[in-house]
């Protein structure tokens, strides 16, 4: 979100131009950390998350003791679509269909939550080893549109659900895709689940599990 409308294959050197308060707050937090590291015996790693989704791949769904997103009234696309597929929501919306993208809807880089957790560990160990502040993008360098995600959820779940076309939301960039070469080249991080089907399947399994234990 710190990149704003910057586009595809965003590197850590891409201009920062947040277009909403959330992105601006992220940028300010980064500046505070980096400024502090210049004047004190303090180093940090800043991870720029792209769109996190999915649920823990090691979940044992025979028990209620599992890891995943339990947010009420979530605003995350994959979670909302999966909630529709399992019947928790009657419908969902697509906000804008005239963006300058391949199908008119926003494009995002979705990363599985387990890979994000592993990126934290990899960057932490690299920080301990090199004792140097760094910024890393955490994504897969691949983008999927809103329409593509919704259709993939329908396909994997074998369920249809109502999708409304709504007005654009102010502050939604058309496309955000991570250039992840820096974290891949400079830390031990290696993505394990960089596949949209895998991400959505884990999210669907999670939502079905929540229905059983609510």
Please provide the spans of the model-predicted regions.
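Catalytic helix-loop patch of NAD(P)-dependent Rossmann-fold dehydrogenases
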Residues: 1-53, 57-76
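C-terminal substrate-binding subdomain of Rossmann-fold SDR/epimerase-dehydratase oxidoreductases
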Residues: 78-214
């Amino acid at each position: 979100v710190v990149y704003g409308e910057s586009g595809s294959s965003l590197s850590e050197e891409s201009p920062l131009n947040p277009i909403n308060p959330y992105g601006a707050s992220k940028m300010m937090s980064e500046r505070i950390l980096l400024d502090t590291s210049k004047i004190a015996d303090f180093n940090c790693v800043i991870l720029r998350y792209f769109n996190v989704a999915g649920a823990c791949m090691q979940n044992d769904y025979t028990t209620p003791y599992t890891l995943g997103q339990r947010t009420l009234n979530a605003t995350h696309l994959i979670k909302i679509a999966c909630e529709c597929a399992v019947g928790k929501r009657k419908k969902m919306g697509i906000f804008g269909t005239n963006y300058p993208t391949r199908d008119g809807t926003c494009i995002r880089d979705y990363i599985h939550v387990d890979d994000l957790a592993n990126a934290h560990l990899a960057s932490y160990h690299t920080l301990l080893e090199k004792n140097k502040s760094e910024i890393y993008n955490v994504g897969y360098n691949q983008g999927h549109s809103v329409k593509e995600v919704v259709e993939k959820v329908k396909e994997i779940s074998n369920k249809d659900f109502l999708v409304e076309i709504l007005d654009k939301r102010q502050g939604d960039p058309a496309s955000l895709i991570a250039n992840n070469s820096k974290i891949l080249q400079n830390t031990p991080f290696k993505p394990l689940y960089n596949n949209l089907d895998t991400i959505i399947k884990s999210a669907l399994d999670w939502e079905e599990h929540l229905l059983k234990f609510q």
